[in-house]
Swiss-Prot record:
It is found in: Cytoplasm. Belongs to the class-I aminoacyl-tRNA synthetase family. Glutamate--tRNA ligase type 1 subfamily. It is an enzyme of class 6 (ligase). A motif ('HIGH' region) lies at residues 10-20. It comes from Pseudomonas putida (strain W619). Keywords: Aminoacyl-tRNA synthetase, ATP-binding, Cytoplasm, Ligase, Nucleotide-binding, Protein biosynthesis. Gene3D superfamilies: 1.10.10.350, HUPs (3.40.50.620). GO terms for molecular function: ATP binding; glutamate-tRNA ligase activity; tRNA binding; zinc ion binding. This is Glutamate--tRNA ligase. ATP binds at K254. Pfam families: Anticodon_2 (PF19269), tRNA-synt_1c (PF00749). The lineage of its organism: Bacteria, Pseudomonadati, Pseudomonadota, Gammaproteobacteria, Pseudomonadales.
Length: 493
């Protein structure tokens, strides 16, 4: 009997997302319910954005939740390497195989040519897509341009008409017209694969039998199916999971909800409760109970109990469930978890240097630095009153800083300062005009330890959460303001 093998393949390009944890949980439960194996693979072909720090955060977040893997970059296994950046020769070999078989072709089009092609198609009211012009090149010209070292990509051929039937374990057969598919790039001009080629090659070579992924990938499923057909490989069973939603039914995004697993750990949520809540996202136990452990979910896991309606990720409901778990802890374990969460030596050593020189007794630490141990702050709107800025300017400054911080890849004091400086300069203000607002939003006080040091210590998730909290207190941002300020943001270096 074939061993069930599932996987999660996140990209290490930012904070570990709750959506990644959600898909990982369901892949894990499906594999373990069938006595199978769960694999972690790192999709790090985006060399500009991928970092080992983000990769380690993925490891830490999944392990904090209690999700372990049988094979992966850090534990090894018989199907490695498990980082796509280390599998370049493998992808190149299979891409060449597709070209030789006539299923793919070399494309030498420049970015300017592709942009012109797109503009002309849109002007004609057509859906922008590659027009296949490289297919008209003779073999001799292709070889000449390759020999000359001309930059190129490899694209796959796709049918121009007909229907592709996608067998989905949740929806049954889904029909998608081929004329919606573009001639997908498989190998980029830097020699690295795109998601589509790497995904198919890796899943096949790693023996993946079932793929549970987000439903946002369903429209592009025909490309993957066609690649399996081109290679002559058996396709894994496919399951397209419903996407997590904000309370307003929009797709879960960090602009409306904290999306990082690290944020919920820092806020003091229990990993058991977090997993429990993610397990209830579109799935339910046979007896409909709300509170259950990972082991209980594995024992009763059945894909037929997944609902296709977009599950709502609601922090208030998560908090309620966390309270159920927390209150059932033995007092000794409760105390131990509190100490591990807030008063562990690593965290205290980050805070101590900034507090020690400002107090005369230990009892003064809490009033000065208590915000380091809080999640949501009790804010006073009076703290945001400015002699220099109008109420609208206050909100504008804070919103633009929040947006700039959302784009920050490396969370360091110098870079945080740079974001704030860029905003105030664009608005022709001084740094001293913005810093009182930062003190108020981040510490809940008019003054404290260096707010820039505090932001670095608190981390990106909690910092951005508190800025959003402050903006909500001040009335939020209207749709008109949002549109106008985003245009302004685009011009801020």
């Amino acid at each position: 009997m074939t061993t069930v093998r599932t996987r999660i393949a996140p990209s290490p390009t930012g904070d570990p997302h709750v959506g990644t944890a959600y898909i990982a949980l369901f892949n894990y439960c499906f594999a373990k319910q069938h006595g199978g194996e769960f694999i972690l693979r790192i999709e790090d072909t985006d060399q500009l954005r991928s970092t080992r720090e983000s990769e380690q955060q993925i490891f830490d977040a999944l392990r904090w939740l209690g999700i372990e893997w049988n094979e992966g970059p850090d534990v090894g296994g018989p199907h490695g390497p498990y980082r796509q950046s280390e599998r370049g020769e493998i992808y190149a070999r299979y891409a060449k195989q597709l070209v030789d078989a006539g299923h793919a072709f070399y494309c030498f089009c420049t970015a300017e040519e592709l942009e012109q092609m797109r503009a002309e198609q849109m002007a004609r009211g057509e859906t922008p897509r590659y027009d296949g012009r490289a297919l008209l090149l003779s073999d001799e010209e292709v070889q000449r341009r390759l020999a000359a070292g001309e930059p190129h990509v490899i694209r796959m051929k796709v049918p121009s008409e007909g229907i592709c039937v996608v067998p989905d374990m949740l929806r049954g057969d889904v029909e998608i017209p081929w004329d919606r598919m573009d001639m997908q790039v498989l190998m980029k001009n830097d020699g690295l694969p795109t998601y589509f080629l790497a995904n198919v090659v890796d899943d096949h070579l790693m023996g993946i039998t079932h793929v549970l992924r987000g439903e946002e990938w369903l429209p592009s499923a025909p490309k993957l199916i066609k690649l399996y057909e081109y290679f002559g490989w058996e396709q894994p069973k496919l399951c397209y999971m419903p996407l997590l939603r904000n309370p307003d039914k929009s797709k879960l995004s960090k602009r409306k909800n904290p999306t990082s697993v690290t944020f919920y750990e820092r806020m003091g949520f229990m990993p058991e409760a977090m997993l429990n809540y993610l397990g209830r996202m579109g799935w339910s136990m046979p007896d409909e109970r709300e509170k259950f452990s990972l082991a209980e979910m594995v024992e009763h896991f059945d894909l037929s109990r997944i609902s296709l309606g977009g599950p709502i990720f609601d922090i208030e409901k998560l908090s309620w469930l966390n309270g159920q778990w927390l209150r059932e802890l033995p007092v000794e374990e409760f105390a131990a978890r509190v100490q591990k969460w807030a008063f562990n030596s690593d965290y205290m050593m980050k805070i101590a240097p900034h507090v020690q020189g400002r107090v005369e007794t230990f009892s003064q630490i809490a009033p000065l630095g208590g915000f380091f141990f809080e999640g949501a702050l009790k804010l006073d709107a009076k703290l945001f009153e400015s002699k220099k800025l109008s109420a609208d300017q206050v909100r504008q400054v804070m919103q633009l800083i929040l947006w700039k911080l959302e784009s920050l890849r490396q969370w360091e004091k110098e870079r945080i300062t740079g974001c704030i400086q860029a905003v105030v300069e664009a608005l022709e203000l001084k740094l001293r005009d913005a810093m009182p607002l930062m003190f108020a939003a981040i510490t809940g006080q008019a003054s404290s330890v260096s707010v820039l040091d505090a932001m670095e210590i608190l981390g990106p998730d909690l910092t951005r959460y508190r800025l959003r909290q402050a903006l909500d207190l001040l009335g939020g941002v209207s749709k008109k303001e949002n549109k106008e300020w985003e245009k302004l943001l685009a011009n801020i270096a």
